[in-house]
């Protein structure tokens, strides 16, 4: 419970989580896991290989579930006038999207582009807020429909992944 609270304590939304070791000798401060790995699938694969060096991507399957991403298209004329605050705000989206995309790209290469690897992630519409603290019913309904649309869009890949998962050799 404490670890999940720490890993999801998004900066400026939730306070950091102070977690004690089992023997209560050390206390650590944990913040949003996305600061380290916005798409932790690649880190999970590396950790898996560390503990299972005899197994390879062809012997495993990975389903990576994203939390959605904001599409950011840069306009050079607009960005030329940005100051530090705007770059800091927009830069956080750019950085998190780039890191998540890079992890997805690398895992596609490791898994040789299917069927053992599948990432589901959706893009927020430009006119929709992607704010984590938006709990308006209209926005929550939008998120549900966004999730349903990504499943519909990727239904074929989901079916192939599921068939591969239950296959017996």
Description of each model-found segment:
Residues 1-169:
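Conserved catalytic cores and adjacent C-terminal regulatory segments
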